UniProtKB/Swiss-Prot annotation:
It comes from Chlamydomonas reinhardtii. It is an enzyme of class 3 (hydrolase). It is a single-pass membrane protein. Signal peptide: none annotated. In contrast to other members of the phospholipase D family, contains only one PLD phosphodiesterase domain, suggesting that it has a single half-catalytic and requires homodimerization to form a complete active site. This is Mitochondrial cardiolipin hydrolase. Residues 164-191 form the PLD phosphodiesterase domain.
C-alpha cells in the first residue's frame, strides 16, 4: 500500500537549536496525517475485499485432521459422553460437512470414490429432505470395500459411473449452483485423518458454471 515509499518521503533534515521545536512539530503532524491516510485506506479496502470473497475463494480446508468430528456433537443436544474420543471443535471435515449440508435445492457430486460415512450420512439426509442429489463416481471404485455407492442407489439417489478403462478422477461438488468444493480430497476416512489433502470452497459464478458444464457433460456421457 505504499507504506515504504511514504516513510522514505518523510525526510529528516538537520535541526538547529533555533527551529528544532518547529521541525519536530511539523514532522509529528506529517506522521499523524500518514496514520490517518493508512487508516482510511484500510477501511475502504474492507468492502472491496468482502466483494472479492463473494466472487472467489471462500475458504481452503487442509487435511489431515487429528480426529474425526463427533457425530453426536453435531446433533441437537450435543454429545453426552463424558470421555468422547472424537473432536468437539471445528475441523476441516466438520467445515466441509457444514458446506455440504447447506444445500437446499441441488447437490451435484463428481468424486472418484466415496467411503466416508460422515459424508454419506449428510448426502442421504439432504436427499431425504428433498434436495435433488446427483452423483458421478468411478466404476472400479464403486465395487471396493466400504463404497457407499450402492447405499445411495438403494436410497433412490441418481448415480452414474464412467464406462471406460480410465478413471473418473474428479473430486468436486456443486451446491445449489452457488458454491463449488474442489481439490485433491477423496471422500474417504483415510483422506480425512491420514492423507495430505485440500478442498477449496469457491463462489465464483464463472468458475462454477464451467464445472457445472463439465458435470452435465459427464452425466450425459455416462447414461
Amino acid at each position: 500500500m505504499g507504506c515504504a515509499s511514504s516513510k522514505e518521503e518523510v525526510a529528516l533534515t538537520p535541526l538547529s537549536d533555533v527551529n528544532a521545536a518547529k521541525e519536530v512539530a511539523d514532522l509529528k503532524a506529517q506522521v499523524d496525517q500518514l496514520k490517518r491516510q493508512l487508516a482510511s485506506a484500510g477501511q475502504s479496502a474492507a468492502p472491496a475485499a468482502a466483494g472479492a470473497v463473494k466472487g472467489g475463494v471462500v475458504e481452503t480446508l487442509f487435511f489431515p485432521d487429528e480426529k474425526l468430528p463427533c457425530r453426536n456433537n453435531r446433533r441437537p443436544g450435543g454429545c453426552k459422553r463424558q470421555h468422547c474420543e472424537y473432536s468437539h471443535t471445528p475441523t476441516s471435515l466438520s467445515r466441509f460437512l457444514d458446506y455440504l449440508g447447506s444445500a437446499t435445492r441441488t447437490l451435484d457430486i463428481c468424486v472418484f470414490t466415496i467411503t466416508n460415512d460422515d459424508i454419506s450420512d449428510v448426502v442421504l439426509e439432504l436427499h431425504n429432505k428433498g434436495v435433488r442429489v446427483r452423483i458421478i463416481s468411478d466404476n472400479d471404485q464403486a465395487h471396493t470395500q466400504g463404497s457407499d455407492i450402492d447405499k445411495f442407489r438403494q436410497a433412490g439417489i441418481a448415480v452414474r459411473q464412467d464406462k471406460t478403462a480410465a478413471h473418473m478422477h474428479h473430486k468436486f461438488a456443486i451446491i445449489d449452483g452457488r458454491l463449488l468444493l474442489n481439490g485433491s480430497f477423496n471422500w474417504t476416512r483415510q483422506a480425512v485423518t491420514a492423507n495430505n489433502e485440500n478442498v477449496t470452497v469457491l463462489s465464483d459464478p464463472k468458475l462454477i458454471a464451467s464445472f457445472q458444464q463439465q458435470f452435465d457433460k459427464l452425466w450425459d456421457m455416462f447414461k
